[in-house]
Amino acid sequence: MATPRRAQLDDKTDITGARVVIVEARFYDDIQDALLEGAKTELDAAGVAYDILSVPGALEIPAAIAIALDAAKKNGRPYEGAVALGCVIRGDTIHFEIVSAESARGLMDLSVSRSLALGNGIITVNNTEQAWERARADDLNKGGDAARAAIQMIRIKRKLAKP
């Protein structure tokens, strides 16, 4: 495995009051617990409030985010961002390719069409060992990476919104 390099982002744009929705696919509970913990740790450290919604699988994540965004806006407590968390492990059929590609496409469509600060933490791997390499509780946790991405995108949105 190549050594990952994380960009050091020094953006200190104020994100006070930021609120995101985490939507997690509970298909692999133990791996999902680790991804969720990584995301929560990063959001808590940044002072970002969050709500958590659980769905059965990765394909349901984009729709659940869209539903959450609409409901939160209607209720007067809109989300500034979202964190998508899940795990898709390759099997013997093309289901892996479909779920991986379509969940990513759905998230990208949401992000672009709604200018949504989105962190994609849906890991797509060949086996359980690779999943744990990306979910373990350290600097490689992809749940934490997804939360950091959403936080940075919120900073960018706020910075560009300033007069």
Swiss-Prot record:
Pathway: Cofactor biosynthesis; riboflavin biosynthesis; riboflavin from 2-hydroxy-3-oxobutyl phosphate and 5-amino-6-(D-ribitylamino)uracil: step 1/2. The keyword Coiled coil does not apply. (2S)-2-hydroxy-3-oxobutyl phosphate binds at D92, T93, R134. One of its GO terms (biological process) is riboflavin biosynthetic process. The keyword Zinc does not apply. It is an enzyme of class 2 (transferase). GO terms for molecular function: 6,7-dimethyl-8-ribityllumazine synthase activity. Coiled coil: none annotated. It catalyses: (2S)-2-hydroxy-3-oxobutyl phosphate + 5-amino-6-(D-ribitylamino)uracil = 6,7-dimethyl-8-(1-D-ribityl)lumazine + phosphate + 2 H2O + H(+). GO terms for cellular component: cytosol; riboflavin synthase complex. The active site is at H95. Keywords: Riboflavin biosynthesis, Transferase. Its EC number is 2.5.1.78. 5-amino-6-(D-ribitylamino)uracil binds at F27, A58, L59, E60, C87, V88, I89, N120. PANTHER family: 6,7-DIMETHYL-8-RIBITYLLUMAZINE SYNTHASE, 6,7-DIMETHYL-8-RIBITYLLUMAZINE SYNTHASE DMRL SYNTHASE LUMAZINE SYNTHASE. Belongs to the DMRL synthase family. Catalyzes the formation of 6,7-dimethyl-8-ribityllumazine by condensation of 5-amino-6-(D-ribitylamino)uracil with 3,4-dihydroxy-2-butanone 4-phosphate. This is the penultimate step in the biosynthesis of riboflavin. HAMAP family: Lumazine_synth (MF_00178). This is 6,7-dimethyl-8-ribityllumazine synthase. It comes from Afipia carboxidovorans (strain ATCC 49405 / DSM 1227 / KCTC 32145 / OM5) (Oligotropha carboxidovorans).
